[in-house]
A protein has these predicted regions:
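Alpha-helical segments in soluble extracytoplasmic regions
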Residues: 1-23
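Short, charged, amphipathic alpha-helical segments
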Residues: 3-11, 31-41, 58-68
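Short, solvent-exposed, charged loop/turn and helix-capping segments
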Residues: 19-34, 50-61
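C-terminal amphipathic alpha-helix
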Residues: 42-85
Length: 85
């Protein structure tokens, strides 16, 4: 996966997480937020696959590890599948 593609996926993930935050802050509806979290995690799977396949700078991999860990905490909270290693 090229850097441009990875950046597009990162932008999609950022937008998805913004929707999660906005929905939760506005409505506090666990069902709707669970759905939005699930969508965000689906997007994050694309990034994760690229990170696992590609030879990326160690700092990029370290940052993704941190983000992925936080996403998985969110997945646990909303009882949706985690981003797999």
């Amino acid at each position: 996966m090229r850097e441009e593609e990875l950046n597009r996926h990162a932008d999609r993930l950022e937008r998805a997480m913004n929707r999660v935050r906005e929905s939760w802050n506005r409505e506090r509806n666990p069902g709707k937020t669970r759905y939005l979290v699930s969508e965000a995690l689906t997007t994050s799977q694309e990034i994760n696959r690229a990170m696992m396949r590609g030879r990326l700078h160690p700092e990029v991999q370290k940052q993704w590890f941190i983000v992925r860990s936080e996403l998985n905490r969110l997945a646990e909270a909303f009882e949706v599948p985690k981003v797999r290693w």
